[in-house]
Amino acid sequence: MEMVVQGVSTRNIKKVTEELCGESFSKSAVSEICKELDVPVKHFKERLLPEHYPFIIVDAIYLKAREDHRVKSKALFVAIGINNTGHKEVLGFEVYDSEKVNTWRDFFENLKSRGLRGVDIVISDAHAGLVEAIKESFSGSSWQRCQAHFTRNIIDKCPKKYSTGLASELRDMFNAATIEEARRLKESIYDEYQDVANEAMTVLDEGFEDSITIMALPSKYRIALRT
């Protein structure tokens, strides 16, 4: 069962059990054993969410899955809730064909139907469909652009010879003690790099304010919510 949880294929499970146990398990037998996971997974995904989670982090991870005798790319949506004490909990996950407004909306509405409420800040990357669904499903909440994704977006547009220095200065900017200090450092970075990394500075300028939403919170929350 542990091999299944770790993502080992049924074919490889068969090989491992033969080598370790000296006994052969067919792929169908392994598949039947795997079905034992269906009930606890279903229970986990459908459980109620009575606790208050003012902050949620959402993201999609792309995985390969076999469907209709073909290997396809699938998007695994994940939501992590953070309560007032800083405790993190996986609120839900679901597999979709792709990231679109309607798939993210469906995912969020499922969380809300299970009791998710009072969300103050949603942290995510800047995928257009995701951001639009956040606005629709969590109206009145603030959006924090994931600082790790944002940094990569900036560095991807920066000439390689400047990327290390820029990445270091961006870290200092995000580690600033106050919003005012972060804004001062942002302007300094912009002035320093606009001539040599103009596209990167455009990304920084356009997305900066959304990336410092959490700066309005007490410092004890910021590290957990930045990405």
Regions found by a protein language model. Name each.
Residues 121-128, 133-169:
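Conserved beta-strand -> loop -> alpha-helix junction used to position metal-binding or nucleic-acid-contacting
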Residues 14, 65-66, 131-132, 156, ...:
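Short helix/loop capping segments that flank catalytic or ligand/cofactor-binding pockets
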Residues 1-7:
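Short, amphipathic alpha-helical "recognition" segments used to contact nucleic acids or chromatin
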Residues 100, 146, 178-181:
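Alpha-helix N-cap recognition
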Residues 11-22:
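DNA-recognition alpha helix
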Residues 23-27, 32-123, 128, 132, ...:
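RNase H-like nuclease fold core
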Residues 11, 28, 120-121, 149, ...:
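Short, solvent-exposed positions on alpha-helices
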Residues 175-227:
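Acidic/histidine-rich catalytic cores and adjacent linkers
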